[in-house]
Amino acid sequence: DSRHRMFNILKVSEDINPKNYSVKEDGKLEIEWSEGDHTSYYDPNWLRENCYTIKNKQKYVSPYNLWDSSLQKNLKSIQIDHDEIINSDEGLVKWLELLHYTGIAIVKNAPIEKNSALKVLNRISHTRETFFNTPFEVINIPKPNNSAYTAHALRNHMDLPWFENPPGYQFLHCLINSAKGGDSSAVDAFAVADYLRNNEKDIFDILVNTPLKFRDKDYTQEAVRSVYGTAISLTKDGDYNDIRYSIATLDALDCHPDIMDSVYKAHHRFGNLLHDAKFQINFRLEPGDIFSFNNRRLLHGRTEFDPNSGHRHLQGYYMDRDE
């Protein structure tokens, strides 16, 4: 039962009201309406869940486990074995819970053949296609159309912030990592946002309320993509919904002159906190690891690596959270 509304609710007048009402023996509320010769029955649990009083709304508790650099001491808590996901629904649920509540999970002991991550990813759903192809190859190439395809260090960032709807999840499958350098970093941007909300509210409010432009120019497609979005977006309950942030692709500031200075300072502060050691964890991906995370919560980066000292090859995949 989809519970989709089949009748035209717009034909119900704005002045409709209960004609008679009573509580039945099973606890349900019975209402006879003033028009339409219709009687409704409401379960008390449904009424409580949909009660819109301020007192009821204050009961909301965030499901997210916010974390900082202290997670470095317990990286095993975000690890799960590849075969556990493949062979059991319990393993799949554990993986999904890590992704949803903590925003990060490292799948261990996956095969290291090209495209082999698709099997475990399909335990969740199908991947999302982009112009980077699936999978996209994270390797050092001579003429890259993205900074990821170089040996340079990458500051903590989300992928594709210039998309209208950036991918919800990202998966980086390590095939080879023998080069010197190339260690990974991650930061819970929800935790950084929460720090600002509790300690620097003026900056937090600017990041929530001021849309800025993100832009990408891709020579391989002769295309320019851009979109406006706030660095922090919230749910109706005031919880964290999305982070949209990448220093590399944040375009020239485009806001009212009266707030330009404060907007610049707010983004400067946010960017610095997203790289602060007190919020960041660091680790090295080993062949067979799949670094999986909420792309609209967790920012990721890497240190510079020496392509002459060995090889580094990751395959990347995207997936929408709706899936």
Predicted regions and their residues:
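Active-site environment of non-heme Fe oxygenases that use a 2-His-1-carboxylate facial triad
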Residues: C51-T53, K57-I104, N109-E323
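Motif-centric detector for short Cys/His coordination patterns
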Residues: D1-S88
